[in-house]
Regions:
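Structured C-terminal helix/loop/strand segments within mature extracytoplasmic catalytic/sensor domains
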Residues: 417-463
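Active-site-proximal alpha-helical segments within enzyme catalytic domains
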Residues: 302-309, 347-368, 423-440
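N-terminal leader/targeting segments and the immediately adjacent pre-domain N-terminus
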Residues: 16-71, 78-190, 216-220, 252, ...
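Bacterial Sec-dependent N-terminal signal peptides
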Residues: 1-24
């Protein structure tokens, strides 16, 4: 069992009955140490939760909790991890051992702590001192609100709400208007200097690479069948199944391949994404399909198939292609391409928020950045236009999502890259607006947060 899954599934506590002597709302700090990583934990008895401090916070209720006098133990029936400890009334602390899924015991002690001293527990430990124009770095111009037509009142209200934790686990907010960065703020112990996992925002980067490959004549347009670009072992076995599928079907999520990435949470074996860990997920997936062109079905394997097409069509590894054709021309140096699978395919990568902004600003400028045409302008328009409706006011292009917002009594179009947990690049061409957000909303609804932030604050802030 994956250690992180087992750990995060355990990290929540029911209230300790009988502790009675503790002052109201005390917090306990502990560190769970593995050879390769240290997990900082905060126990909040009043809220009955154990928080993981850092970039992946979570809390999940326990199935079992026992207390016999000062002996404390908790576990979860469907996991093989648990904790046993002893509460010491004199020190007001808890000492014990965490037993993980391979039966290894690890000492874990909790001591009383002021959470305000623990960075990462709250959105901001040191209060904001007021608005400041972001620093000029790496070719991204910066301007004050007054020079780009932004209402400072709405921005200040939004930042206050982020400071108060009204939008949980939003770690970054960057706003660019009329080609200049005007807002750059970070929360929950993140400062923007490190690369952040962008999850399925990676798909929109692959869309850009596809447009470049089409312009170079390496692949055809949307009607090009994928069969001729698949690895040889698939051409023989699944040619009759894959033959009708085109690049259009791949990038618009209409392949007809049976896949359910929505009904069950990620990590649940019933979620089709679990197939991605199989020895040969493509072969398993192609065994069941409907005719391509069927209604939209979000499918991360489509992204992997597109990577395969590009690798075979360009003659470049996916790593070489994305680095030489996209990241380097954008001046992006601090990145992580993540783990490649045994087929050499890139899943999701990590970028700094500012570098995500560069990508969004390039698309706003029809594929041009710093005087260089990186992505064909025609492809920017093609890939970000709606190809298939998803639900009310939500559509999908070629690895880009589409929506509209209300602005001054009319609707303005928006396309956006969207990754699990709250990773976003929003582009609103009519307002010359680009917004980047990163988050760790693994168990909440980041779509609701992001839409509220955009519709209630950032879009109407544009004068």
């Amino acid at each position: 069992m994956n250690r992180l899954v087992g750990l995060f599934a355990m990290l929540s506590l029911m209230e300790f009955p009988g502790f009675g002597q503790e002052p109201a709302h005390q917090f306990y700090f502990g560190v769970l140490t593995y050879p390769e990583h240290r997990y900082r934990l905060i126990l909040d008895i009043e809220d009955s939760a154990l928080y993981v401090i850092g970039l992946r916070p979570n809390r999940i209720p326990l199935d079992k909790f026992r207390r016999d006098k000062n002996q404390i133990s908790f576990s979860r029936a469907d996991f093989f991890s648990g904790y046993e400890g002893i509460f010491n009334p004199a020190s007001n602390g808890i000492a014990g051992y965490w037993t993980d899924d391979d039966k290894k015991k690890i000492m874990l002690e909790f001591r009383v702590v002021d959470p305000d001293t623990i960075s990462g527990f709250k959105p901001r430990v040191v209060p904001r001192s007021g608005y400041g124009v972001p620093a000029v770095e790496e070719g991204i111009p910066t301007r004050p609100f007054s020079e780009v037509g932004i209402d400072p009142g709405r921005i200040e209200t939004l930042l206050d709400r982020l400071d108060e934790g009204d939008f949980e686990y939003v770690h970054s907010l960057l706003v660019s208007r009329r080609g200049a960065l005007v807002v750059e703020d970070y929360f929950y112990d993140f400062n923007g200097s490190a690369a952040f996992g962008i999850q399925s925002v990676t798909k929109s980067l692959v869309s850009a690479l596809t447009g470049m490959a089409i312009a170079r004549g390496e692949v055809g347009g949307g009607n090009d069948p994928i069969l001729k670009w698949l690895d040889k072992k698939y051409k023989r076995d699944i040619s009759n199944i894959a033959a009708p599928i085109t690049l259009h079907h791949l990038m618009s999520m209409t392949t007809g391949l049976e896949w359910d990435e929505v009904t069950y949470d990620y990590g649940d074996e019933r979620n089709s994404l679990s197939l991605a860990d199989a020895r040969d997920p493509f072969r398993l997936l192609f065994q069941k399909r409907k005719l391509p062109g069927n209604p939209f079905a979000y499918n991360s394997i489509n992204h992997s198939l597109m990577n395969m097409v590009l690798r075979n069509a360009t003659g470049l590894t996916n790593e070489m292609e994305i680095t030489s054709r996209l990241l380097e021309p954008l001046g992006i140096k601090n990145f992580d391409l993540g783990n490649r699978d045994n087929r050499g395919l890139i899943g999701d990568i990590s970028l700094r928020p500012r570098d995500m902004l560069k990508f969004g600003m390039m698309y706003l400028n029809r594929g041009e950045f710093a005087g260089k045409q990186i992505v064909p302008a025609e492809w920017v328009e093609i890939s970000t236009s709606t190809k298939v409706p998803v639900k009310e006011n939500l559509g999908y292009g070629y690895f880009w999502w589409t929506t509209t917002y209300e602005w001054k009594g009319k609707e303005v179009g928006c396309y956006f890259a969207w990754g699990h947990g709250g990773q976003y690049i929003f582009v609103v061409p009519d307002l010359e607006l680009v917004v980047v957000m990163n988050g760790t909303n693994w168990s909440t609804d980041p779509e609701r947060y992001s839409r509220q932030i955009m519709q209630d604050y950032l879009v109407p802030a544009c004068e």
